[in-house]
């Protein structure tokens, strides 16, 4: 069956997506004899009672089915980013003090080092969710039409955006859990006693630092709101939930609220850094701290998003996505392909 070329609206394609129940469909078919009886909901258990394993998946299909095909690229990217960030943080937090001052901080690896890796991976994966959409808009502007296929690598990337987003939410939740575990660490309690002893030695009655208090209150609040929006995005990506939404509702949540969560995560990292941007001691072996590297890609994505929202570009993108074609660019592309 061929789909007509007139069906190009995403909302129409959303309505065409099958949402029915398999049992209701099988019950409504006009089969005769025992087959129709077994397909009724009340007697469906009789059909599954005999040779369940043989009917569920034939032996020849067990060898041809792929194992998590849509998750391969996102998991590989997440593993690479996690490994590189871990080695980078290990070099800064553990190896550097060991080499320069013979101080051993290996106890930081299970919690502190890992908790610097998690936010870096989470915000980078979230940026990778929205970067291909902006690249696709640039490609459409360059081609002057929406009917020309995207490059294979971009097409594969766009199909994996859901998995990138779910992995980002997973790492963000781990980051929140690890952060909440800070006061439970024995090393933190020892450090707290040392800070109190130093305060007594310095004869300080109040150790309140106004700007540090504001810094922590703001970035914790931003982190909570950003994680809540990420949770909403993760819930709406569940098929049963997305099927209950209209195209406009689903598109609004995934696109608009997704960018808001990326913005909140970026500001969360910037406020966490506070005045460390100009602190020379933060640069170990001329290497910047991880939060400086973490905000680079999200900031680039947000800048590109703002640029594409300019009226001169936004109107043209909307016209192209509605079916308009730039004849001059199409003819130029055809002439270049012939040459």
Curated annotation (Swiss-Prot):
<keyword id="KW-0274">FAD</keyword>
<dbReference type="GO" id="GO:0020037">
    <property type="term" value="F:heme binding"/>
</dbReference>
<feature type="domain" description="Ferric oxidoreductase">
    <location>
        <begin position="118"/>
        <end position="265"/>
    </location>
</feature>
<comment type="subunit">
    <text>Homotrimer.</text>
</comment>
<dbReference type="GO" id="GO:0005768">
    <property type="term" value="C:endosome"/>
</dbReference>
<feature type="modified residue" description="Phosphoserine">
    <location>
        <position position="28"/>
    </location>
</feature>
<keyword id="KW-1133">Transmembrane helix</keyword>
<feature type="transmembrane region" description="Helical">
    <location>
        <begin position="283"/>
        <end position="303"/>
    </location>
</feature>
<feature type="binding site">
    <location>
        <position position="237"/>
    </location>
    <ligand>
        <name>FAD</name>
    </ligand>
</feature>
<comment type="function">
    <text>Does not function as a metalloreductase due to the absence of binding sites for the electron-donating substrate NADPH.</text>
</comment>
<feature type="binding site" description="axial binding residue">
    <location>
        <position position="175"/>
    </location>
    <ligand>
        <name>heme b</name>
    </ligand>
</feature>
<protein>
    <recommendedName>
        <fullName>STEAP1 protein</fullName>
    </recommendedName>
</protein>
<dbReference type="GO" id="GO:0005886">
    <property type="term" value="C:plasma membrane"/>
</dbReference>
<comment type="similarity">
    <text>Belongs to the STEAP family.</text>
</comment>
<keyword id="KW-0472">Membrane</keyword>
<feature type="transmembrane region" description="Helical">
    <location>
        <begin position="164"/>
        <end position="184"/>
    </location>
</feature>
<keyword id="KW-0285">Flavoprotein</keyword>
<feature type="compositionally biased region" description="Polar residues">
    <location>
        <begin position="1"/>
        <end position="11"/>
    </location>
</feature>
<keyword id="KW-0967">Endosome</keyword>
<feature type="transmembrane region" description="Helical">
    <location>
        <begin position="258"/>
        <end position="278"/>
    </location>
</feature>
<dbReference type="Pfam" id="PF01794">
    <property type="entry name" value="Ferric_reduct"/>
</dbReference>
<dbReference type="InterPro" id="IPR013130">
    <property type="entry name" value="Fe3_Rdtase_TM_dom"/>
</dbReference>
<dbReference type="GO" id="GO:0046872">
    <property type="term" value="F:metal ion binding"/>
</dbReference>
<feature type="binding site">
    <location>
        <position position="254"/>
    </location>
    <ligand>
        <name>FAD</name>
    </ligand>
</feature>
<feature type="region of interest" description="Disordered">
    <location>
        <begin position="1"/>
        <end position="34"/>
    </location>
</feature>
<keyword id="KW-0408">Iron</keyword>
<dbReference type="GO" id="GO:0010008">
    <property type="term" value="C:endosome membrane"/>
</dbReference>
<feature type="binding site" description="axial binding residue">
    <location>
        <position position="268"/>
    </location>
    <ligand>
        <name>heme b</name>
    </ligand>
</feature>
<feature type="transmembrane region" description="Helical">
    <location>
        <begin position="109"/>
        <end position="129"/>
    </location>
</feature>
<feature type="binding site">
    <location>
        <position position="161"/>
    </location>
    <ligand>
        <name>FAD</name>
    </ligand>
</feature>
<dbReference type="InterPro" id="IPR051267">
    <property type="entry name" value="STEAP_metalloreductase"/>
</dbReference>
<feature type="binding site">
    <location>
        <position position="140"/>
    </location>
    <ligand>
        <name>FAD</name>
    </ligand>
</feature>
<feature type="transmembrane region" description="Helical">
    <location>
        <begin position="79"/>
        <end position="99"/>
    </location>
</feature>
<keyword id="KW-0479">Metal-binding</keyword>
<keyword id="KW-1003">Cell membrane</keyword>
<keyword id="KW-0597">Phosphoprotein</keyword>
<feature type="transmembrane region" description="Helical">
    <location>
        <begin position="218"/>
        <end position="238"/>
    </location>
</feature>
<keyword id="KW-0812">Transmembrane</keyword>
<keyword id="KW-0349">Heme</keyword>
């Amino acid at each position: 069956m061929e789909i007509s070329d007139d069906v190009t609206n995403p909302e129409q394609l959303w309505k065409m997506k099958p949402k029915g129940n398999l049992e209701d469909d099988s019950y409504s078919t006009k089969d005769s004899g025992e087959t129709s009886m077994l397909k009724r909901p009340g007697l469906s258990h009789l059909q599954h009672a005999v040779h369940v394993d043989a009917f569920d998946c034939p032996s020849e299909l067990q060898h041809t089915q792929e194992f998590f095909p849509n998750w391969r690229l996102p998991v590989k990217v997440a593993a690479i980013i996690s490994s590189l960030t871990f080695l980078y943080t290990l070099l800064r937090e553990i190896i550097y003090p060991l080499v320069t001052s013979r101080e051993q901080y290996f106890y930081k690896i299970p919690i502190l080092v890992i908790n610097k890796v998690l936010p870096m991976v989470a915000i980078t994966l979230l940026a990778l969710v929205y970067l291909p959409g902006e690249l696709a808009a640039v490609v459409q502007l360059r081609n002057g039409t929406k009917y020309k296929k995207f490059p294979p690598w971009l097409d594969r990337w766009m199909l994996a955006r859901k998995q990138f987003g779910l992995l980002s939410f997973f790492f963000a939740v781990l980051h929140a859990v690890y952060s909440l575990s800070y006061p439970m660490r024995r090393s933190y309690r020892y450090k707290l006693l040392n800070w109190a002893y130093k305060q007594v030695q310095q004869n300080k009655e109040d150790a309140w630092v106004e700007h540090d208090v504001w810094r922590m209150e703001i970035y914790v609040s931003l982190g909570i709101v950003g994680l809540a929006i990420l949770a909403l995005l993760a819930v709406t990506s569940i098929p049963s939930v997305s099927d209950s939404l209209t195209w406009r509702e689903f598109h609004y949540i995934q696109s608009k609220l997704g960018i808001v969560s990326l913005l909140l995560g970026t500001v969360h990292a910037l406020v966490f850094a506070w005045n460390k941007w100009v602190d020379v001691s933060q640069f170990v072996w001329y290497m910047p701290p991880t939060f400086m590297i973490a905000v680079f890609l999200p900031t680039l994505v947000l800048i590109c998003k703002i640029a594409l929202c300019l009226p001169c570009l936004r109107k043209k993108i909307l016209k192209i996505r509605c079916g308009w074609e730039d004849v001059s660019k199409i003819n130029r592309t055809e002439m270049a392909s012939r040459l």
